[in-house]
Amino acid sequence: MSEQNAQGADEVVDLNNEMKARREKLAALREQGIPFPNDFRRDRTSDQLHAEFDAKEAEELEALNIEVSVAGRMMTRRIMGKASFVTLQDVGGRIQLYVARDDLPEGVYNEQFKKWDLGDILGAKGKLFKTKTGELSIHCTELRLLTKALRPLPDKFHGLQDQEARYRQRYLDLISNDESRNTFKTRSKILAGIRQFMVARGFMEVETPMMQVIPGGASARPFITHHNALDLDMYLRIAPELYLKRLVVGGFERVFEINRNFRNEGISVRHNPEFTMMELYMAYADYKDLIELTESLFRTLAQDVLGTTQVPYGDEVFDFGKPFEKLTMHEAIKKYRPETDMADLDNFDSAKAIAESIGIHVEKSWGLGRIVTEIFDEVAEAHLIQPTFITEYPAEVSPLARRNDVNPEITDRFEFFIGGREIGNGFSELNDAEDQAQRFLDQVNAKAAGDDEAMFYDEDYVTALEHGLPPTAGLGIGIDRMVMLFTNSHTIRDVILFPAMRPVK
């Protein structure tokens, strides 16, 4: 047996012995009557205590004579004869307990407290005071075991063994990793901030179907499921777009939805098959209005959630305080591939030659617009570090966007990039029912030619457009990628509580 395998075997034995001892303690608790009591109530969390009392001097705390009740997980314990110090962790952080034998009911200290284990969940009551080192603490007069932990804390056995364990057992990651807890607290604040921002601007939050007969609103491969009662194959939605625009037809002029989308595609540091999007639609507006809204949203969130418009990310600092850069797709290609002749981007053969010269395999079904978009993706996208809007997307890759009035080969569309990745996509909506029907037919032909991500023909949506969609602009923002930026996270798995994982065999 190798040294590594021997060490692993020893750890398994240690863990089994530890769990055996803990189960024996639980059995003793069961014999006493109520092993998992639910009658303890706390009146403060640790962060509330620190916010209110950290600044007070020891003498002032003593004079105030404040009694508090707290509850949480025992993370550390230092037993020093007749007294001990405990670190208790709750949702707000950590607070220190001072536990003295003579201040508790008879027998609690030696017969109960000393037999409890790290990871157990406790309830404590006592007076606030400060130690000689100035640490806010609770001098306990009551201490109760609320939940017996049968497994030890991860750091007792060298922490979580690998990165994947953090995702598979997120509960352990949250117990032991302050950074992870803060990431998901920030995510919650971002979502609350988005809702506040949208409602303040007259938008109504709505919910649209997660299972759809026709998957639409994006170019992606869907998940397929079966509805037994209807005996009908259905699709998990890839986007809510077409349903939201039906609502605008119906008279709800400003709507938004924050919810899950599902795309049966690859998993990477930027992609999870199940992800969260915010989509909004705004009648009597165009894509330029949404550029302004997007810039304001990100600037507001940075200031409100992080307290600054200078957001660090790896070696970069994203500046949400200054005006965001705006480039057309052709301008971006020229900027990051200076030798490009702009005229070549308007000619199929010339653009194809450029694409092939930089290693892009051009499919037979691609038109000029798709080729130029692929060139942009290859030469420019990774360089768009600071907040940047890219405009004038080809109509070929924008089947739901309104054509530009001056040049019908492009659309009134933008994508929003930060850190070299797309964060948002918005455009003036196509509200010409006949044009939309033709573009759906083009997508059907592309699917027949082998494009799995091409859209289906949605006859009911065309019918809705025939009733009249007001001039409208729509925007989609990837919430997970937004959270990555605001929390300095470099993989999408770090900002999704339970990311998609292959089952452990």
UniProtKB/Swiss-Prot annotation:
<dbReference type="GO" id="GO:0005524">
    <property type="term" value="F:ATP binding"/>
</dbReference>
<dbReference type="InterPro" id="IPR045864">
    <property type="entry name" value="aa-tRNA-synth_II/BPL/LPL"/>
</dbReference>
<dbReference type="GO" id="GO:0000287">
    <property type="term" value="F:magnesium ion binding"/>
</dbReference>
<dbReference type="GO" id="GO:0005829">
    <property type="term" value="C:cytosol"/>
</dbReference>
<dbReference type="InterPro" id="IPR004364">
    <property type="entry name" value="Aa-tRNA-synt_II"/>
</dbReference>
<dbReference type="InterPro" id="IPR006195">
    <property type="entry name" value="aa-tRNA-synth_II"/>
</dbReference>
<dbReference type="InterPro" id="IPR044136">
    <property type="entry name" value="Lys-tRNA-ligase_II_N"/>
</dbReference>
<keyword id="KW-0067">ATP-binding</keyword>
<feature type="binding site">
    <location>
        <position position="422"/>
    </location>
    <ligand>
        <name>Mg(2+) 1</name>
    </ligand>
</feature>
<dbReference type="GO" id="GO:0006430">
    <property type="term" value="P:lysyl-tRNA aminoacylation"/>
</dbReference>
<dbReference type="Pfam" id="PF01336">
    <property type="entry name" value="tRNA_anti-codon"/>
</dbReference>
<keyword id="KW-0460">Magnesium</keyword>
<dbReference type="InterPro" id="IPR012340">
    <property type="entry name" value="NA-bd_OB-fold"/>
</dbReference>
<dbReference type="InterPro" id="IPR034762">
    <property type="entry name" value="Lys-tRNA-ligase_II_bac/euk"/>
</dbReference>
<feature type="binding site">
    <location>
        <position position="422"/>
    </location>
    <ligand>
        <name>Mg(2+) 2</name>
    </ligand>
</feature>
<dbReference type="InterPro" id="IPR018149">
    <property type="entry name" value="Lys-tRNA-synth_II_C"/>
</dbReference>
<feature type="binding site">
    <location>
        <position position="415"/>
    </location>
    <ligand>
        <name>Mg(2+) 1</name>
    </ligand>
</feature>
<keyword id="KW-0963">Cytoplasm</keyword>
<dbReference type="InterPro" id="IPR002313">
    <property type="entry name" value="Lys-tRNA-ligase_II"/>
</dbReference>
<dbReference type="Pfam" id="PF00152">
    <property type="entry name" value="tRNA-synt_2"/>
</dbReference>
<keyword id="KW-0648">Protein biosynthesis</keyword>
<dbReference type="GO" id="GO:0000049">
    <property type="term" value="F:tRNA binding"/>
</dbReference>
<dbReference type="GO" id="GO:0004824">
    <property type="term" value="F:lysine-tRNA ligase activity"/>
</dbReference>
<dbReference type="InterPro" id="IPR004365">
    <property type="entry name" value="NA-bd_OB_tRNA"/>
</dbReference>
<comment type="similarity">
    <text>Belongs to the class-II aminoacyl-tRNA synthetase family.</text>
</comment>
<keyword id="KW-0030">Aminoacyl-tRNA synthetase</keyword>
<keyword id="KW-0547">Nucleotide-binding</keyword>
<keyword id="KW-0479">Metal-binding</keyword>
<comment type="subunit">
    <text>Homodimer.</text>
</comment>
<protein>
    <recommendedName>
        <fullName>Lysine--tRNA ligase</fullName>
        <ecNumber>6.1.1.6</ecNumber>
    </recommendedName>
</protein>
<keyword id="KW-0436">Ligase</keyword>
